[in-house]
Curated annotation (Swiss-Prot):
Binds to plexin family members and plays an important role in the regulation of developmental processes. Required for normal cardiovascular development during embryogenesis. Functions as attractant for growing axons, and thereby plays an important role in axon growth and axon guidance. One of its GO terms (cellular component) is plasma membrane. This is Semaphorin-3C. Expressed intensely in the heart, skeletal muscle, colon, small intestine, ovary, testis, and prostate. Faint expression ubiquitously among other organs, including brain. GO terms for biological process: axon guidance; blood vessel remodeling; cardiac endothelial to mesenchymal transition; cardiac right ventricle morphogenesis; dichotomous subdivision of terminal units involved in salivary gland branching; immune response; limb bud formation; negative chemotaxis. It comes from Homo sapiens. Glycans are attached at residues 81, 123, 252, 268, 465, 585-586. One of its GO terms (molecular function) is semaphorin receptor binding. Interacts with PLXND1.
């Protein structure tokens, strides 16, 4: 029965390997939630065992706090350790609003609560906070104190309407930025969720929004993110960029397609004087493309923008915009990461405008006269120093913006292809954060990619010779135990920490765990982690300012042969030899699991003192990711097996297994229905002398039986030791008699 169970498990194991086998790259290190906690490089926070839809909405590195919104709660967590010194404010929706929400047919659990979706810094002492308010948005001011040591965290003002500042539906994303105590938001402004707007509120000036119900401006948008980005040296030329995806009808107006878009407005826009009153007069948008071009020409688009990260530099024009995209097709599923130069984005907004012409409303480049100042220009900036406000714009400029908000050219990524593509995986990317790391052999971008399965992949971008960047998955970490999709992610390069949220809670993870790679120079070098280097004693954090020349690191090639000379490389050529026994005609498994799934495995077999030869794989001998499966063991399988792993042209012996084959009849007689741990105590009850047993087997056979029984005994230490030995004495006696006669005929003189 046990053997049958083993066979079934082995079959399932093989099938799982076949199913999971894919050309998609795998993480070099995978840590489960519990394994990650054991490394002492992560922390976890949750208010309760019930899901509360946590969102990390603001990170303040000056006050060492991160601010989290959840259902009915506002949280202030310690940026150094989120599980310590947590502050919270209970801020539920009013009972009346909750009852009205339920009567309107909304979800009592996931809709009829106050889901906090906006937390922005208002001034040195207060935050501005908004929540969905059970489909009746509310906002308030929250006192956080002047210093983090004050331990102040409370609402000290009355609530006000959040309409135009936060979406009614908590499942519809709200994005926002705060500039000079003015709130710029992208959200849906009504209960039914039909009026989308980019809105400026909380202002001493007039409130301004996008043109209402104008599909040229916004067409069922789903907002993703918003950022303030400088444009030149004049601060008046800065723009607020909104990233979103929207549903657009094709030329036949029959089907809707999802396109990812970037829109921008000037923060000092006060609307038009006669047209577009209290509407944006600087609103422009452009399509954001992330696609793979097939060999025969057509493009495969990753249409749906999921998240955006801006990797800033000293020069704003060299800022990189990272975006995560997924496919909208039900047949073709995948994720991609595309990277854009901010200068390319600004070039598109300074380029030709789109214009629909002809009966099919075909988009063409606008060929008419462009009014002055150029539509989309900010008042009071470098190009319009004499215009203090948009109300001074000529009417033709305002009219042009209303009818031509779309740019003709699309925005393409660097090299016009994605940096990372994942197809046919059981996950999709949801969030992204990027860190710039200085290593011994150059500067690298390290991507942290959150998935819908509660994991974070740590990916390093590697330069190649043909202007195409490669990528290597260094780690995949289970940051949430129940595989909850990641909803928000913030990174602190200053603290070297990553903060991740899900429906269940918030996790904090260090950007590096150098000690997990191994205790040898080669292990550290093969990891190719730009955060880590071999310091002569261990794999530890690499600091580019260090003066020690013994630091060994090779991110680009990961070659221990050039980096680890003098650090006991010969130890990798040999592994400790172990003895393993198999029973003839049964199935056995020779275990060999390399540290890295990116390593290739080769099995070599050495019989007696012959040369090692590569094991020939077939239906009986199967190589798996965990070792070598030998079905129906034969005598010819006996020998010394070498498991050789090759990674980056570096070879090392992972395992040496001296495999010995036992006769099935002999093992059956000795072990069938016999408890191995009571053999010695029960041998006196046998109807023959113990010397008869010793003489029935050769010396080598007895050694193998002893070792086999020892191994079996260790596997059954937890069994029932009170069970007495039982067996077929007649069968054993017959075997002993036959072995006696055979041994007398083949007896060799003792040396």
């Amino acid at each position: 029965m046990a053997f049958r169970t083993i066979c079934v498990l082995v079959g399932v194991f093989i099938c799982s390997i076949c199913v999971k086998g894919s050309s998609q790259p795998q993480a070099r290190v995978y840590l489960t939630f519990d394994e990650l906690r054991e490394t002492k490089t992560s922390e976890y926070f949750s208010l309760s065992h019930h899901p509360l839809d946590y969102r990390i909405l603001l990170m303040d590195e000056d006050q060492d706090r991160i601010y989290v919104g959840s259902k009915d709660h506002i949280l202030s967590l310690n940026i150094n350790n989120i599980s310590q010194e947590a502050l919270s404010v209970f801020w539920p929706a009013s009972t009346i609003k909750v009852e009205e929400c339920k009567m309107a047919g909304k979800d009592p659990t996931h809709g009829c609560g106050n889901f906090v979706r906006v937390i922005q810094t208002f001034n040195r002492t207060h935050l501005y906070v908004c929540g969905s308010g059970a489909f009746s948005p509310v906002c308030t001011y929250l006192n956080r104190g002047r210093r983090s040591e004050d331990q102040v965290f409370m609402i000290d003002s009355k609530c006000e309407s959040g309409k135009g500042r936060c979406s009614f539906n908590p499942n519809v994303n709200t994005v926002s930025v705060m500039i000079n105590e003015e709130l710029f938001s992208g959200m849906y402004i009504d209960f039914m969720g039909t009026d989308a707007a980019i809105f400026r509120s909380l202002t001493k000036r007039n409130a301004v929004r996008t043109d209402q119900h104008n599909s040229k401006w916004l067409s069922e948008p789903m907002f993703v993110d918003a950022h303030v980005i400088p444009d030149g040296t004049d601060p008046n030329d800065a723009k607020v960029y909104f990233f979103f995806k929207e549903k657009l009808t094709d030329n036949n107006r029959s089907t809707k397609q999802i396109h990812s878009m970037i829109a921008r407005i000037c923060p000092n826009d006060t609307g038009g004087l006669r047209s577009l009153v209290n509407k944006w007069t600087t609103f422009l948008k452009a399509r954001l493309v992330c696609s793979v071009t097939d060999e025969d020409g057509p493009e495969t688009h990753f249409d749906e923008l999921e998240d955006v990260f801006l990797l800033e530099t000293d020069n704003p024009r060299t800022t990189l915009v990272y975006g995560i995209f997924t496919t909208s097709s039900s047949v073709f599923k995948g994720s991609a990461v595309c990277v854009y130069h901010l200068s390319d984005i600004q070039t598109v907004f300074n380029g030709p405008f789109a214009h629909k012409e002809g009966p099919n409303h075909q988009l063409i480049s606008y060929q008419g006269r462009i009014p002055y100042p150029r539509p989309g220009t900010c008042p009071g900036g470098a190009f319009t120093p004499n215009m203090r406000t948009t109300k001074e714009f000529p009417d033709d400029v305002v009219t042009f913006i209303r009818n031509h908000p779309l740019m003709y050219n699309s925005i393409y990524p660097i090299h016009k292809r994605p940096l990372i593509v994942r197809i046919g995986t059981d996950y999709k990317y949801t969030k992204i954060a990027v860190d710039r790391v200085n290593a011994a052999d150059g500067r690298y971008h390290v991507l942290f990619l959150g998935t819908d399965r509660g994991t974070v992949q740590k990916v390093v971008v590697l330069p190649t010779n043909n202007s195409v960047s490669g990528e290597l998955i260094l780690e995949e970490l289970e940051v949430f135990k129940n595989h909850a999709p990641i909803t928000t992610m913030k990174i602190s390069s200053k603290k070297q920490q990553l903060y991740v949220s899900s429906n269940e809670g918030v996790s904090q993870v260090s950007l590096h765990r150098c000690h997990i790679y191994g205790t040898a120079c080669a292990d550290c070098c093969l990891a190719r982690d730009p955060y880590c280097a071999w310091d002569g004693h261990s794999c530890s954090r690499f600091y580019p300012t260090g003066k020690r020349r013994s630091r060994r690191q090779d991110v680009r090639h990961g070659n221990p042969l050039t980096q680890c000379r003098g650090f006991n490389l010969k130890a990798y050529r040999n592994a400790a030899e172990i003895v393993q026994y198999g029973v003839k005609n049964n199935t056995t498994f020779l275990e060999c699991a390399p540290k890295s799934p990116q390593a290739s495995i080769k099995w070599l077999l050495q019989k007696d003192k012959d040369r090692r030869k590569e094991v020939k794989l077939n239906e009986r001998i199967i190589a798996t990711s965990q070792g070598l499966l030998i079905r129906s063991v034969q005598g010819s399988d006996q020998g010394l097996y070498h498991c050789i792993a090759t990674e980056n042209s570096f070879k090392q012996t992972i395992a040496k297994i001296n495999f010995k084959v036992l006769d099935s009849e002999m093992v059956a007689v000795v072990t069938d229905k016999w408890s191995p741990w009571t053999w010695a105590s029960s041998v006196r009850a046998l109807p023959f002398h113990p010397k008869d047993i010793m003489g029935a087997f050769s010396h080598s056979e007895m050694q193998m039986i002893n070792q086999y029984c020892k191994d079996t005994r260790q596997q059954h230490q937890q069994g029932d030791e009170s069970q007495k030995m039982r067996g077929d004495y007649g069968k054993l006696k017959a075997l002993i008699n036959s072995r006696k006669s055979r041994n007398r005929r083949n007896q060799l003189p003792e040396s």
